[in-house]
């Protein structure tokens, strides 16, 4: 398999630059304003002129303005960015029917039946980059490798506005040398846990008993890392986008008090159910944004549809789990529903 990964460079801020060329060359910061007080909220993304000063996604707006008071600060306009993203994704579909849209600014293409080798893949990547730049004035970074994970790693190495191939020999080298924190899907907290076990490189996961690894980071992540370290990872491109509906709300103050958080959580559920229309979810995730803007979530999938009453009770259990497992205060709380079935009016399809 040959996978081509496309990552839109500093996407939200770049769209703002395209729409307003006078912003080019200036530090631009796109923000999610929470409305708690003036400048409350967090940075969604920043262009490279801002990043070189330390302004990056996730930091509080107040902190960003201390670092870079003269930058251009703009509110996030998700609908505008989504329109541009949709057009670019349609361009990508011209190059492969097998496309997995990972997010608003990332996509994987299986180009195995389009090219014969990595040299042709590289040329196709250049063609895609030039086409997107010509049509949308947006620069992207392209990573190419034998699977999705190493294609993403290749793009991370080539940012911004670059292109890189990680061939099979370089994959073997990276398995030996790649820092565990640089593996996609392994966040800082998980990386810290692994390093306490002596796992500093990807290959180190092979030197520890699987049950011990599973006990530390969970079965799914343990299997994921082992398959990568053995050079056996081959998850296919999934052409269907996982659809979910949810809502996250900002609380008046950071808290770890269950009773204080519950009304905000229930509000998120109520607003999410309003958007479900006739779809019934089988999966629920409670999503918490912590005081340091990290994201923690816990979820459950049911064999049948979830009624609103079940969503209320299950969400409290999931919230309790988050509070038990994480000592940080919660800043924002929300819920995400997925794995939908169509409503047919029969009670037996609910898990109550």
Curated annotation (Swiss-Prot):
Main subcellular localisation: cytoplasm
Matches recorded under PROSITE patterns: UMUC
GO MF annotation terms: damaged DNA binding; DNA-directed DNA polymerase activity; magnesium ion binding
GO cellular component: cytoplasm
Annotated positions for site Substrate discrimination: 12
Cofactor(s) named in the record: Mg(2+)
Gene3D superfamilies per UniProt: 3.30.70.270, 3.40.1170.60, 5' to 3' exonuclease, C-terminal subdomain, DNA polymerase, Y-family, little finger domain
InterPro entries attached to this UniProt entry: DNA/RNA_pol_sf, DNA_pol_Y-fam_lit_finger_sf, DNA_pol_Y-fam_little_finger, DNA_polymerase-Y, DNApol_IV, PolY_HhH_motif, Rev_trsase/Diguanyl_cyclase, UmuC
Subcellular locations according to the entry: Cytoplasm
EC numbers on record: 2.7.7.7
UniProt keyword Magnesium present: yes
Cofactor notes: Binds 2 magnesium ions per subunit.
Highest taxon listed in the record's lineage: Archaea
Residues annotated to bind Mg(2+): 7, 105
Catalytic activity: DNA(n) + a 2'-deoxyribonucleoside 5'-triphosphate = DNA(n+1) + diphosphate
Keywords on record: Cytoplasm, DNA damage, DNA repair, DNA replication, DNA-binding, DNA-directed DNA polymerase, Magnesium, Metal-binding, Mutator protein, Nucleotidyltransferase, Transferase
Entry remark concerning the domains of this protein: The catalytic core consists of fingers, palm and thumb subdomains, but the fingers and thumb subdomains are much smaller than in high-fidelity polymerases; residues from five sequence motifs of the Y-family cluster around an active site cleft that can accommodate DNA and nucleotide substrates with relaxed geometric constraints, with consequently higher rates of misincorporation and low processivity.
Role this protein plays: Poorly processive, error-prone DNA polymerase involved in untargeted mutagenesis. Copies undamaged DNA at stalled replication forks, which arise in vivo from mismatched or misaligned primer ends. These misaligned primers can be extended by PolIV. Exhibits no 3'-5' exonuclease (proofreading) activity. It is involved in translesional synthesis.
Quaternary structure (record): Monomer. Interacts with the PCNA heterotrimer via PCNA1.
Sequence similarity: Belongs to the DNA polymerase type-Y family.
Official protein name in the record: DNA polymerase IV
Gene: dbh
